[in-house]
Amino acid sequence: MATGRNIVESTSKLQEANNSISNWCKSWKIKLNETKSVHVNFTQKKIENQPRVKLNGIEVPLDDKAKYLGMTLDAKLNWKEHFKIKRKELELKYRELYWLIGRNSSLTIYNKILTYNQVLKPVWCYGISISGCAKQANLNIIQTFQNKVLRDIVNAPWFIRNSDLHRDLKIPLVTDEIRKYARKHKERLSQHVNAEASSLIRNQPTIRRLRRVLPTDLG
């Protein structure tokens, strides 16, 4: 990853880093798979004639998203793709568990909630202290899934409100869960032994564009 005042500067820095990595891998006889690499420009601007970078002489394909440590980073960092992928993962897992926690299951509500918290909830909670700064429309991708699962767990009729279900079952809304994780994340960063990590809390941008929410705002 490289930053710059413009696309040419950042691409030039990225190419220098790629060359250094390629030389290091050659000296240690490590084979790189260029086809699994992607080139993403993280910016709100529309870029035409994007400069390309190469790895071992092969052009790295341009893409509008990249996967890193289980997170899907899109070019505009609005997290929509990330939550859509998480929703698909949740739907697949829920289909496998429906016989156990669905409307027709004889399992107690307590055990159904326990299963949801232990199996399904960690899927969307992973990295939520960072991706939670997405706009509400994207967070609703997960919230609507949680609403559906809770309704199935208690076999709720159509006239029962989702807010009542969350209150009675003592399940936090997605936005409340985000704030809880964000506070813990902020506390860990402020006490981190690594100066680079702790500086993430102190060095906040002075210019805020488009009223975007930063991860540090959530805590």
Residue ranges and their predicted role:
Residues 198-219:
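C-terminal helix/juxtamembrane-tail motif
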Residues 16, 23, 30-65:
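Short, conserved micro-motifs composed of acidic
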Residues 22-33, 38-40, 114-115, 130, ...:
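Short, charged alpha-helical motifs in flexible N/C-terminal segments and linkers
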Residues 58-130:
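Basic, alpha-helical interaction scaffolds
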Residues 1-23, 44, 77-79:
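Catalytic palm subdomain of template-directed nucleic-acid polymerases
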Residues 7-10, 79, 83, 105-112, ...:
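Residue-level recognition of alpha-helical structural elements
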Residues 11-14, 18, 32, 83, ...:
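Hydrophobic packing residues in well-ordered alpha-helices of helical domains and bundles
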